[in-house]
Structures are given as C-alpha cells and as structure tokens.
From Swiss-Prot:
Ranges in a coiled coil: none
Residue ranges of the region described as Disordered: 1-20
This protein's name: Cytochrome c oxidase subunit 5B heart, mitochondrial
Species this chain originates from: Oncorhynchus mykiss
Annotated function: Component of the cytochrome c oxidase, the last enzyme in the mitochondrial electron transport chain which drives oxidative phosphorylation. The respiratory chain contains 3 multisubunit complexes succinate dehydrogenase (complex II, CII), ubiquinol-cytochrome c oxidoreductase (cytochrome b-c1 complex, complex III, CIII) and cytochrome c oxidase (complex IV, CIV), that cooperate to transfer electrons derived from NADH and succinate to molecular oxygen, creating an electrochemical gradient over the inner membrane that drives transmembrane transport and the ATP synthase.
Major site of localization recorded for this protein: mitochondrion
Subunit structure comment from the entry: Component of the cytochrome c oxidase (complex IV, CIV), a multisubunit enzyme composed of 14 subunits. The complex is composed of a catalytic core of 3 subunits MT-CO1, MT-CO2 and MT-CO3, encoded in the mitochondrial DNA, and 11 supernumerary subunits COX4I, COX5A, COX5B, COX6A, COX6B, COX6C, COX7A, COX7B, COX7C, COX8 and NDUFA4, which are encoded in the nuclear genome.
Keywords: Membrane, Mitochondrion, Mitochondrion inner membrane
Amino acid sequence: XXLKGIPTDEEQATGLEEYA
C-alpha cells in the first residue's frame, strides 16, 4: 500500500483502502 495512510490509485480502484 501506500505510505502515510494514503492508498495508491490501484488500491483506491480495488477498494483496498485499509490505510485511510
């Protein structure tokens, strides 16, 4: 995932926003 709780474009598209 991305850093600092910010999901990448792919993660947002796939719904993997477990960092938000």
